[in-house]
Amino acid sequence: FEASDCVSCGACSQACPTSAISDVFQSKAIEATKSTRTICTYCGVGCNLEVSTSNGEILSIQAPYDAEVNQGHTCIKGRYAFKFYNHQDRLDSPMIKRNGVFEKVSWDEVYDYLASKLGHFRDEFGPDSIAGISSARCTNEENYLMQKFIRTVIGTNNIDGCARVCHSPTALGMQRTFGTGAATNSIDDLNDTNCIMVIGANPTDAHPVTGAKLKQFAMKSDHVSIVIDPRRTELAKYANHHLALRPGTNVALLNMMMYYIITEGLIDSSFVASRTEGYDAFQNEILNIDLDALESVTGVNREDVKAAAIAYATAPNAMSFHGLGVTEHSQGTFTVIQIADLALLTGNIGRRGVGVNPL
């Protein structure tokens, strides 16, 4: 069992029709007095969860089969990591530090305290002496209210969030190429694609439910999988092409792929002519790259890059997925642009089973 690929996600216990496989939390669900549909907060997949509770305590979490995102599946954390909700060390009231010690206070008191302090700093040092930092774990509405509070109540533009670091390269790169910074396709489009390219992402660890779907795709013999990552990730074990480039050479490797797509005559000429701009200048730049230098920089054999490029370009439908290994880098925006350019060169945009998808 230890040597297997099992990650103890609990899907078998939920699916077993005879309860021969079960878990202690699932059996407790019969004691629940309330069931609530909610969304998992651990990663960005957005799995739906059915939470069974009694007297405010979580007894069991199951994955509903009618959920479009996860379709009855969830990871080990989504299903089992919930004891902290009712843990005795969890804060259940606001606290103010007095004489070096945190003391519990009422909500009315803490609101008065915050309003007084923020008002003092704003009046004494000016609005720009205050800054707000929001979070990707907040809802869209909460983030909107946070920036509205900082801008209109405090009177400053000093508002930031963690997504600026991890997602802004994707938003900017895709906006420059496609006009919008969102994923172009649904994860369900894996059912309609023939090839996936995963670059700078380890979804079986970071996005387990999506990663499981990608792994299922990669394990099928009639599908093509390309993994571009310095590490031998779980998906790399099943990939047809694993390009283990040196860290920081994403742009160089993608330039090599586009070079071979152009020189092998694999571009979608009609798509490029009708849907893109500036191709002639782009082609001239790509054809003038120094393959010897790029091969040396990336540490990847050019023939391996060529084979992966041909596999991507010749697939009837090809999807790409990229993660923080691409975006949290000084070349993040340029790499996203190159990934988008690959899709444009081969016409892999604008229909089911294709596209560029940030994780």
For the regions a protein language model found, what residue spans apply to each?
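Conserved phosphate/anionic-ligand binding catalytic regions in large, soluble enzymes, centered on
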Residues: G46, N70-G78, F82, Q331-T335, ...
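Iron-sulfur cluster-binding cysteine motifs and their immediate structural context
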Residues: F1, A11-K28, G46-E57, C75
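Immediate flanking context of iron-sulfur cluster ligation sites
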Residues: A3-S4, E31-T38, G56-Q71
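Short Cys/His-rich metal-coordination motifs, predominantly Zn2+-binding knuckles/fingers
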Residues: C9, C43, G78
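A short glycine-leucine-enriched loop at secondary-structure breakpoints
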Residues: C9-A11, G299
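Catalytic P-loop NTP-binding/switch module of NTPases
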Residues: I58-R98
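Cofactor-pocket helix-loop regions in the catalytic cores of large enzyme subunits
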Residues: A3-S4, S27-T41, M95-L359
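Extreme N-terminal leader/targeting regions
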Residues: Y42-V45, E50-V51, N55-E57, A67, ...
